[in-house]
Amino acid sequence: MYLKDIIRGVKDMIKIDLITGFLGAGKTTFIKKYASYLMKQGRKIGILENDFGAVNVDMLLLQDLEGDNCSLEMIAGGCDADCHRRRFKTKLIAMAMSGYDRVIIEPSGIYDVDEFFDALYEEPLDRFYEPGNVIALVDAGLEEDLSKEAKYLLATEVADAGCVLFSKCDEVPEKQLKATLSYLNQALEQVHCKRRFTLDQILCKSWEDLDEADHKRLLTCGYRM
């Protein structure tokens, strides 16, 4: 199919949500909840596993979501960064003809959010897609001895997020929540980002306890630039 045919076939801009978080933060479990809510609202969604590894275990964990209103796609890893970016762009172009209302992207645990926005503003993706929500998951018991590179990535993941969620918050005391929040703000300061968070701005809840108001908050949280 030619690109001009794809462009004609896309009637409305498709929103893309990016779900970020380090390995173990609970991205896959959260996506199952989030995607299930979207499907209950009658949305047709595509989930794209943008994995830099050679084997994608998360894809297996999400398989029970597949059906008429949900499809799973994957970008295979095992290549260099430039090759992976090309595959990412090609996959999104192909997905534009699938009639999705929304696409959810789960990148690997190491991902620069700027690359997400850079890709969406390139042609021809800017004709098909627009940024939806950027949701950042942070382990409430986050270790406070991250490497300089990991701390930078942590800051980039939350800096543009429309909503930050603390995962496993029911497993740690409030003192630890405050310590994680402080570490998060330190990471932002070190990359010269002016944004800071207070605890009441963080969605701190077990995924099982998310209610209608929480889902609406997530669905409309957007992103910050």
Name each region found by the language model.
Residues 149-153:
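Charged helix-capping and loop-helix junction motifs
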Residues 123-129, 154-156, 181, 185-190:
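A short alpha->loop->secondary-structure connector
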Residues 8-9, 54, 172-225:
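C-terminal accessory "lid"/substrate-recognition subdomains
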Residues 143, 170-173:
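Short histidine/acidic/glycine/proline-rich micro-motifs that form metal-
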Residues 97, 155-158:
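A short, aliphatic-rich alpha-helical micro-motif
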Residues 14-20, 25, 29-147:
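Nucleotide-state-sensitive switch-loop elements of NTP-binding domains
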Residues 46, 130-138, 158-169, 188-207:
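Conserved beta-strand/loop subsegment of P-loop NTPase cores
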Residues 1-12:
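Short, Lys/Arg-enriched N-terminal segments with co-localized hydrophobic residues
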